[in-house]
Amino acid sequence: MDVAAMQVKIVDIIANQLGVDKEIITPEANVVDDLGADSLDVVELVMALEEAFDVEIPDEDAESIRTVKDIFDYLAKNKAA
């Protein structure tokens, strides 16, 4: 999967999990502050990303993910080949 396709898929997952419009999901958007996720939403989002990209995101890594760009960067670096 190329980077552009991966980013589209991530945006789709975020929109679905958080119930937000794709238009407000920018790389700089903070998942909690800008997209309105609470702690349960974040856990569910991480689980959805793990399933979609066949990757395990350890809790300590998940805690460092704040923005949509953080998600893009993490998955680009760690997704299964």
UniProtKB/Swiss-Prot annotation:
<keyword id="KW-0443">Lipid metabolism</keyword>
<dbReference type="GO" id="GO:0000035">
    <property type="term" value="F:acyl binding"/>
</dbReference>
<keyword id="KW-0444">Lipid biosynthesis</keyword>
<comment type="pathway">
    <text>Lipid metabolism; fatty acid biosynthesis.</text>
</comment>
<feature type="domain" description="Carrier">
    <location>
        <begin position="1"/>
        <end position="79"/>
    </location>
</feature>
<dbReference type="GO" id="GO:0005829">
    <property type="term" value="C:cytosol"/>
</dbReference>
<keyword id="KW-0276">Fatty acid metabolism</keyword>
<comment type="function">
    <text>Carrier of the growing fatty acid chain in fatty acid biosynthesis.</text>
</comment>
<dbReference type="GO" id="GO:0000036">
    <property type="term" value="F:acyl carrier activity"/>
</dbReference>
<dbReference type="InterPro" id="IPR009081">
    <property type="entry name" value="PP-bd_ACP"/>
</dbReference>
<comment type="similarity">
    <text>Belongs to the acyl carrier protein (ACP) family.</text>
</comment>
<dbReference type="Pfam" id="PF00550">
    <property type="entry name" value="PP-binding"/>
</dbReference>
<dbReference type="GO" id="GO:0016020">
    <property type="term" value="C:membrane"/>
</dbReference>
<keyword id="KW-0275">Fatty acid biosynthesis</keyword>
<keyword id="KW-0963">Cytoplasm</keyword>
<keyword id="KW-0597">Phosphoprotein</keyword>
<dbReference type="GO" id="GO:0009245">
    <property type="term" value="P:lipid A biosynthetic process"/>
</dbReference>
<keyword id="KW-0596">Phosphopantetheine</keyword>
<dbReference type="InterPro" id="IPR006162">
    <property type="entry name" value="Ppantetheine_attach_site"/>
</dbReference>
<protein>
    <recommendedName>
        <fullName>Acyl carrier protein</fullName>
    </recommendedName>
</protein>
<dbReference type="GO" id="GO:0031177">
    <property type="term" value="F:phosphopantetheine binding"/>
</dbReference>
<dbReference type="InterPro" id="IPR020806">
    <property type="entry name" value="PKS_PP-bd"/>
</dbReference>
<dbReference type="InterPro" id="IPR003231">
    <property type="entry name" value="ACP"/>
</dbReference>
<feature type="modified residue" description="O-(pantetheine 4'-phosphoryl)serine">
    <location>
        <position position="39"/>
    </location>
</feature>
<dbReference type="InterPro" id="IPR036736">
    <property type="entry name" value="ACP-like_sf"/>
</dbReference>
